[in-house]
Structures are given as structure tokens and as C-alpha cells.
Amino acid sequence: MGQKIHPYGFRLGVTKNWRSRWVAPFEKYPEYIVQDEKIRTLINKHYGHAGISSVEIERLGNKMRVIIWTARPGMIIGKQGAEIERLREEIVKLLKNDYEVRIAIYEVKNPETDAQIVSDSIARQIERRVSYKRAMKQAISRAMRSGAQGIKIAVSGRLGGAEIARREWFVQGKLPLSTLKSDVDYGYSIAVTKYGTIGVKCWIYKGDVEDLQELLPPRGLERAERRPERHANA
């Protein structure tokens, strides 16, 4: 069987950026990772209906910046910023007042081509007993109309209440999963039904990143440029 790597992790540092950006002493790493996971769980629990694409967390000393990418920023900000202030207070309480927390909200301009938002939408429809085939086909159609070059959606579990779990998928366009320069977005969601849980996976190909050099860290570029000079001097 072919072994499949996570599409996001495969491209970290190439076409994708880390969603947790901080440096910590060795003994603090487990604590920071658990805190990040609790923050993401809190946000998705309260604002999952707002079309959350991703939650990025930055730390510097005792300061923390939480960046939320969402399709409906107004639902998180609230009237006169009331909701976002309540969320900030909950995060501060979760962290036991150890951090000065700031929250930044960014709008996802094209949610039809955001894999996490698409998979969440399909999962919610399955929970409302909408036909999974209909939900998948509609999502594929919207994504292709919105500029995606390829899309694959897979669902697995007791589909339609069947006794035996199975896996089904639909594919349209091209999906170069093994090419590092290809911009492939990936999302995963779980639909909770009375028959059990159904997993929803979504891959969306948005085209190639033309200039990879701009995405590489400066230090790596400097080392790459100096290497031929060392050989020449030798």
C-alpha cells in the first residue's frame, strides 16, 4: 500500500508556514504545545459556525498573538468588539494570566477554495442528514467555479447508516500531491451522527508557487550562495 504523508507537513518551510511560531526551552515545549491545542479547541468549540480556516499562535516573552482566519469575521468580533473581548478574556483565563494576549482576525476571501472550511461545511451537512454525495458534489462544483485547479473529497464511516463502514471519494481536476511547489490545501473534519462518526477529508489544488526562493529562509539562501565559493577556493 502507498504511504501518505500529511500534505501540510510535507510543505512546511517550502510553501506553508508554521501555525505555532515560538521558541521555548526544552522543558517548556510540552506545556506550550498543550496550551496551543487548548486555545484552538476553545476557538473551534465556540466559533466553529463562523467558518474557521486556521488558528495561528505567536509568542514572544510574555506576549501572545492569536491570529484567526475565518470566512465570517463579524461573528467573532461581535457588536462593538464584545465577542472578541470575551474570547480574549477566556484565553487569558485559560493561560492563568501568564500572557498579554492580543487577537487578530483575518477574513478568508475565497472560502470555497479553503479545504478546512469546505470539509467543515460537508461535516455539518452530514450531521443535518443531508446526503453526503450531494454535499460533496456541490462543494466540488463551487470550488472549481471559484478558481481551484483540482479537488478531492473523501468520506469514511457508516455512510447513510450502513451496517459496514466504507470509504468513498470524488475527484475533479488535477492534484499533484508529490510536488513541493504545488499549493495544495488540506482539511479534515469529523461529523458526529447517531450511527457513529464520519471522517471528511479535503484536498484542494490552487496552482503552483512560481518563485520558491522567496519562501526560503534568508539564512538558508546565504549558505547556498556561499557553498560554491568554498569549493572554488579549495
UniProtKB/Swiss-Prot annotation:
Domain KH type-2 residue range list: 39-109
N-terminal signal peptide: none
Domain of life of the organism encoding this protein: Bacteria
Annotated SUPFAM superfamilies: Prokaryotic type KH domain (KH-domain type II), Ribosomal protein S3 C-terminal domain
Gene3D superfamilies attached to this UniProt entry: 3.30.300.20, Ribosomal protein S3, C-terminal domain (3.30.1140.32)
Subunit structure: Part of the 30S ribosomal subunit. Forms a tight complex with proteins S10 and S14.
Protein name: Small ribosomal subunit protein uS3
Function, in words: Binds the lower part of the 30S subunit head. Binds mRNA in the 70S ribosome, positioning it for translation.
Keywords tagged on the record: Ribonucleoprotein, Ribosomal protein, RNA-binding, rRNA-binding
GO BP annotation list: translation
Family affiliation: Belongs to the universal ribosomal protein uS3 family.
Phylogenetic lineage: Bacteria, Pseudomonadati, Coprothermobacterota, Coprothermobacteria, Coprothermobacterales
InterPro entries noted in UniProt: KH_dom-like_a/b (IPR015946), KH_dom_type_2 (IPR004044), KH_sf_prok-type (IPR009019), Ribosomal_S3_C_sf (IPR036419), Ribosomal_uS3_bac-typ (IPR005704), Ribosomal_uS3_C (IPR001351), Ribosomal_uS3_CS (IPR018280)
Gene it is expressed from: rpsC
UniProt keyword Ribonucleoprotein, yes or no: yes
Molecular-function GO term, any one: rRNA binding
Kinase among keywords: no
UniProt source species: Coprothermobacter proteolyticus (strain ATCC 35245 / DSM 5265 / OCM 4 / BT)
Gene Ontology CC terms: cytosolic small ribosomal subunit
HAMAP family given in the database record: Ribosomal_uS3_B
